[in-house]
C-alpha cells in the first residue's frame, strides 16, 4: 500500500506529459515572409505573465490598429503551436506578429485551469511556426528576420534598427535592404554612425 501514492504520482506525470504533446507544423518562413499574414505587428514590452499568457504594453504599432490598452497574448499549452511562455519574461522587449483570436474553439477553456487556455476572443496568439517574433534591445532587433535557417530563433546576424523593420512592414524598403543591414560589419557601421554624429555636432 505504501507504493500507491508513488504510483499515482507517476501516472499523473505521464498524463501531464501526454497533455503537453508537441505540436506539428511546417516552417512558414522568416519574419519577412510571415508578418503580412498576421493581424497586428507591434513593438512591445512584456509587463506581466500568468499561466500561458503574457500581457504586452505596445510601444509602437508597425501594422494594424493601435491598441487602446495593454494586450494579452496566449502562448503554448497542450499541443498548440506556440512558443513557451518562459521565453518572454517581464521587462523584455519584442517585435511580434500576432493573430487575433476571433472565435472560441472546442476544449479551448477549462474552468479548472483558467490560466491555461487557448485564449479569449479579442485577445491575440503568437505562432511558433515561423519568425513571428524578434528580440528587441533598445532600438535594435535580432532574430529570424530574413532568409534565416528554419527553426533557428537567434541566427548569427548584425542587429537591425527597429525603424528599418518598421519601414519594411510599411512597404517602404525591401527585404533585400533588411538582409544587407543584417550582414553589415558592426564595427564599420559603428564608425559610420559616430562620423554622422560628429558632423551633426559640427553643424
Residue map of PLM features:
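Extracellular secreted precursors and ectodomains with disulfide-bonded cysteine-rich loops/domains
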Residues: 21-23, 79, 127
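Short boundary/loop segments of OB/S1/cold-shock single-stranded nucleic-acid-binding domains
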Residues: 21-38
Amino acid at each position: 500500500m505504501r507504493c500507491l501514492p508513488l504510483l499515482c504520482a507517476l501516472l499523473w506525470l505521464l498524463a501531464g506529459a501526454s497533455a503537453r504533446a508537441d505540436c506539428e507544423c511546417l516552417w512558414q518562413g522568416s519574419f519577412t515572409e510571415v508578418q503580412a499574414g498576421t493581424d497586428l505587428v507591434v513593438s512591445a514590452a512584456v509587463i506581466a505573465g500568468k499561466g500561458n499568457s503574457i500581457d504586452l504594453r505596445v510601444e509602437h504599432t508597425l501594422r494594424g490598429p493601435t491598441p487602446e490598452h495593454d494586450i494579452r497574448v496566449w502562448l503554448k499549452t497542450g499541443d498548440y503551436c506556440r512558443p513557451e511562455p518562459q521565453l518572454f519574461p517581464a521587462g523584455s522587449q519584442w517585435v511580434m506578429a500576432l493573430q487575433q483570436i476571433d472565435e472560441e474553439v472546442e476544449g479551448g477553456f477549462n474552468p479548472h485551469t483558467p490560466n491555461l487556455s487557448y485564449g479569449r476572443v479579442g485577445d491575440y496568439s503568437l505562432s511558433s511556426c515561423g519568425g513571428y517574433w524578434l528580440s528587441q534591445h533598445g532600438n535594435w532587433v535580432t532574430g529570424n528576420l530574413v532568409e534565416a535557417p528554419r527553426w533557428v530563433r537567434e541566427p548569427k546576424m548584425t542587429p537591425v534598427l527597429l525603424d528599418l523593420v518598421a519601414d519594411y512592414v510599411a512597404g517602404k524598403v525591401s527585404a533585400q535592404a533588411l538582409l544587407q543591414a543584417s550582414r553589415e560589419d558592426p564595427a564599420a557601421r559603428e564608425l559610420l554612425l559616430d562620423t554622422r554624429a560628429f558632423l551633426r555636432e559640427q553643424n
